[in-house]
């Protein structure tokens, strides 16, 4: 499958790198990372230890079988505008936050799938991405249920990623948001690593943030 990873930062580079052995992958990212991948390949470190050789560019291709969108959610509208007019069979958001699928669908003609990803990734140097934790990808129609397209994309991703095709993506998106609210926001504000929330004084704040998200959901 011809796969474009739009947003080749930490997560996008890791996901694209893990798929590059079995698919024709193009990473769309920024310099100097793109230049390094072109010159030396993409080095996978941490939980994985190998070098792969995806394509790398700063501009999205005009066509692809699948686009994986991994930009930060505040960049979704800009990414959607850049992808508009492209000939794609499917677009899959692997982003945090809510509403990314609707933003993408308003610009691209291809069907949009929802997804979550729990792999940990860190871009340590240009051309080098470290996997800090092996997780999984869940994907499916953004309104829930099943589809032949989701099954086909899930089969393709399973070549390099732990993949689940799920019929309850709305629930999974909210659950991921609750986890992010309870962990990411609190650790950033308290300037502590994730593990300090388990028994530290910020545990109550993390619990309350996740619970509030669940009530909103």
Predicted regions: what they are:
Residues 33-38, 100-102, 147-148:
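Short, charged/polar "capping" segments at the starts of alpha-helices
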